[in-house]
Amino acid sequence: MTDFYIPPKEISFRLLGYVSQYVLVSRTHNDPQVFHHPKDSENPDQYFQLIPGTGQHAGYYLIKSKYTGKVLFSRLSPSPRVGHIDGSGQYGDNWFQVEVGKGQYTQNFRLRNFASDTVLFSRTHANPQVYNHPASDSNPDQYFTFLFEDMKVDKVEYHLNLGKILSSIPIIIANQTLQNDSSIDQEMAFELDVTETHTSTFEYTTGFTITYGATFKAGVPLVAEAEFKVDTSLSQEWKFGTMTEFGKSYVAKLPVKAPPHTTVRAVSSVNRGDIEVPFTIYLSSKATGFQVQTHGIFRGVSTWDLRHTVSTQDLK
């Protein structure tokens, strides 16, 4: 179960239409002044902030443009029904609820107005393209999502004390034999150099929503001597929300001696299983340095606990 993240007023964002794939703009140099634009052409007039309300407007927000300083409104009359205005929310039609969707829209929301009980929409197939509609009628073009400003990952903290081994089975990674048919001792070194493939992913649960596929670097949680530790030597580039593969190498050298007419066998094995470790990712705005947190679960298929069994058997 995940909670929908509503950003604090210090974090800016673009509002992306679910159907249009355009982002809203607030401008004064062209009409209509509140309109939309293709998301791939990024401009300062596309960024907004949410200012939370109090009192009768608790649970509602001003949608304030970082570019013009104006706040959006949605009303039934007069024209224009959708636009922006100076001020700090003195009118009821300046306040919006972030109404989270259901089903296929669980990662999206409608912007529902306090006074007019209308919702904004963004479409390209008909005019008007950016307008409002009664909230009682739900349509796909009424849904939006946040595209947040550029953030950087400051650190990844694994909560190792809460890590879990969900499954574990032993696997053999090497099986070596020295057979001595002679009448004198024979010595050699069994050498192990094996790389096991690990897979893992970072799954979001709460907090700031990192863009799917966003890249960052972090160490790898692993099991060592029945405890979880972080291996910084395996610092890996991850893509958030996607499966990542990386290798863990096992290297060892075992001197063995085989007495006359014996066989010496060395078996090297590890445990392989599923693990999960809760994490917190600390991020900050590249523009302002304001810090936010993302919480989730690191899930992976891992190996651990390298061990060797050496046995001697007489030849018959």
Which sequence ranges carry the predicted segments?
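Membrane-permeabilization and membrane-interfacing ectodomains
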Residues: 149-316
